[in-house]
């Protein structure tokens, strides 16, 4: 989502002002204008927009996006993901580091799919499962289920990328000999559960996105020892 320069300037100013007093900023974009909202959350590193502020613009179908700031990262929290899904409009995160905005990231299924190769890793949006979802949306016009999650969920007892969850999303297990372009491969990389997914793109290569790296295509044999299973989409 591309903001007008004047709108982006207002968002940046608000985020930096709130960061200076240890708060997250929050606001809404309406008719290409940024409107500041009061953060009524009592918790640090959290935000909440009052029901009245939200409803005033939502009822007229003029609300384009909800924006809030994070201190020192872009990564989506589980609450961010739940909130965006519930509102069905794009959300944006403003990353403030040492008092200065370092960038903005918008996400949501209504936005165009970004390039699949060379994207920055942002947990909850541009991560391994986000890449699988975007591949299926772009290449097959299929909308896969979203799973709200916290960062490093696998180290806290989570099992997001389980075979059961993929089955619920419309996949079934196949043998490696049946592997075709577009099939999904699940991995367990230095974890007790499946914590990575990739798409097979043919010629012995996968498309995937690891933490702290850009999304890329790589030979599958590099990751052979981490493979747990192969999955094919059949529809929900």
Located regions from the model:
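Generic beta-sheet signal
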Residues: 92-94, 209, 233
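Conserved beta-strand-loop surface patch within small alpha/beta domains used
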Residues: 1-63, 71-109
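...with weaker cross-activation on analogous glycine-rich loops/strands in unrelated enzymes
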Residues: 150-216, 220-221
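Active-site nucleophilic cysteine motif
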Residues: 122-139
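Glycine- and charge-enriched low-complexity intrinsically disordered segments
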Residues: 218-236
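Short acidic alpha-helical/loop segments enriched in Asp/Glu that coordinate divalent cations
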Residues: 141-153
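Second-shell loop/turn segments in exported
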Residues: 116-122
């Amino acid at each position: 989502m591309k903001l007008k320069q004047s709108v982006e300037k207002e968002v940046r100013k608000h985020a930096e002002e709130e960061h200076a007093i240890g708060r997250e900023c929050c606001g809404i974009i309406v008719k290409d204008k940024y409107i500041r909202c009061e953060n009524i959350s009592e918790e640090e590193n959290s935000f909440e927009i009052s029901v009245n502020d939200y409803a005033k613009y939502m009822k007229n179908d003029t609300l384009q996006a909800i924006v809030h700031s994070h201190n020192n990262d872009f990564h989506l929290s589980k609450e961010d993901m739940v909130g965006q899904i519930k509102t069905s409009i794009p959300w944006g995160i403003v990353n403030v580091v040492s008092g200065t905005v370092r960038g903005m990231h918008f996400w949501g299924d209504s936005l165009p799919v970004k390039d699949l190769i060379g994207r920055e890793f942002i947990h909850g949006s541009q991560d391994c499962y986000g890449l699988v979802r975007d591949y299926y949306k772009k290449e097959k016009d299929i909308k896969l289920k979203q799973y709200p999650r916290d960062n490093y969920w696998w180290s806290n007892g989570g099992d997001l990328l389980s075979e059961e969850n993929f089955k619920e999303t419309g996949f079934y297990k196949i043998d490696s000999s049946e592997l075709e372009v577009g099939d999904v491969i699940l991995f367990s990389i230095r974890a007790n559960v499946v914590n990575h997914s990739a798409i097979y793109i043919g010629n012995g290569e996968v498309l995937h996105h690891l933490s702290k790296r850009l999304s890329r295509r790589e030979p599958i044999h590099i990751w052979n020892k981490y493979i747990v299973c192969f999955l094919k989409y059949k529809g929900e």
